């Protein structure tokens, strides 16, 4: 499978990261939180939240995933798995 020259990721990997960003954005909005509010609750920077949600394939660290899940009061599994 060819890799993107800029990211080093396959199309499937890029799409998975985009889906994670979409899922976090959906859960955040469902709870009525702004990106700034989620960043504060998760003890992360606004830029980190913005990058994750922007669908740009920056990736997400395991620690950031757990902090965001805790701030959103969901199991990290709910962010990683799509129905």
Spans of model-derived segments:
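A short, Lys/Arg-rich alpha-helix, primarily the initiator
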Residues: 3-30
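Short basic helix-loop element that most often maps to the first helix and adjoining turn
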Residues: 22-41, 67
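Conserved hydrophobic/aromatic packing and binding residues within compact polymer-binding modules
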Residues: 24, 38-39, 49-52, 79
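Recognition helix of helix-turn-helix/homeodomain-like DNA-binding domains
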Residues: 43-59
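Short, basic-rich loop-to-helix N-cap that marks the start of a DNA-contacting helix
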Residues: 56-70
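Short C-terminal boundary/hinge segments that cap the last helix of small helical domains
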Residues: 73-83
């Amino acid at each position: 499978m060819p890799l993107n020259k800029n990211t080093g990721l396959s199309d499937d990997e890029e799409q998975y990261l985009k889906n994670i960003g979409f899922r976090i954005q959906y859960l955040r909005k469902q709870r009525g939180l702004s990106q700034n509010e989620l960043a504060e609750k998760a003890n992360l920077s606004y830029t980190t939240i913005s990058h994750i949600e922007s669908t740009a394939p920056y990736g997400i660290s395991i620690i950031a995933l757990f902090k965001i899940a805790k701030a959103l009061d969901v199991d990290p599994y709910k962010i990683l798995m799509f129905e």
